[in-house]
Amino acid sequence: NPHESIPLNTVINDNFVNDNSGDIMITLTPDEVRARFGPLFSMKYLVMVDHNAGLAEIREHCRARGTIEWDAANRVRAKGAIQSCHVEGTKMTMLARLGVSPANFGAAGKEIGGQALEGVEVVGDEVVTTWSGIAGAGVGVAACLPQAPGVTRAEYPSEEDLRIGGARVCRVRIVSPLYEKVTIGIDDTDTREEGATWVLALKCAEACTIPGVDYLDMRLVQLNPAVPKKTTNCVGSALNFAVRPGKVDALLEYVRDFVESGAVSNDTGIAVYRGIAFAEESPYLKRVKTEILTVDDAEAEAARMGVRFIDSTGRKGRIGALGALLWGNKGVEAAGLYGETL
């Protein structure tokens, strides 16, 4: 059967023969996929891996909101490798387990998804994700997603998987560069007279041109407005980056130099976490929005959570920097007071 899943630990190349079907594995670059099917709609595809957590984070961007929403709903329903999925407009962020995970895949139904992520594997400095889609969802995985900027190549088990549309089933392995996730929290770069931490943080992110570093997003994190020592609104900033192997040190040196050279405060704090998920949720999430904390509190919790500080001051900015980092991937509620939702 040409549509049986291929083990993710199989070495695949242009001359690979699928033992189950006798078909040659067909490998196409994004340009070749585009030439075959015409330009479609995927705008970005990127995969970060956290080996310690056994997770991958997949970022996908499409020109249309409807396709992102339908794909997300069906991938979650199919289960497979997906642990969770979050949609913001035309962008999707998926958390997925590493390894092969059987999916409830087929024509969309009560417990069946018309599109599925069946596996995620790291091979050297690349990540291989295995996808299935039926009918229009097959067009998505076989013709649209493989064109996305960020894809290295697509591997199809057979010619049948390149026959898209109608009621056909398509399967594909999408290969992309391996990234890790780096989250950076920044606070106390300004004073009551001048400066704005969010402006400096965003300028830092957008000015980064290090090869192998991809700026993902930033969040403003509301800290406790009742603290006595603050500029005005008491807001920290968090930056998220996808980073290729061997590029983390260059990124951290760049961020520290940019932020500290642009800061007008002597209290600046910069906190860093490498990874997609923490081993446990930190009580500091609530405390930094509701209590008055000390630098010792922040440093102790950072050490416990695997967070390190790279600032040169060692002063009170570390409190908000850690808070911003911990909230940096929590969603829009990061911008509100504790318990406040939009």
Question: Which ranges hold each PLM region?
Answer:
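N-terminal amphipathic/basic-hydrophobic helices that include classical n-h-c signal peptides
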Residues: N1-I24
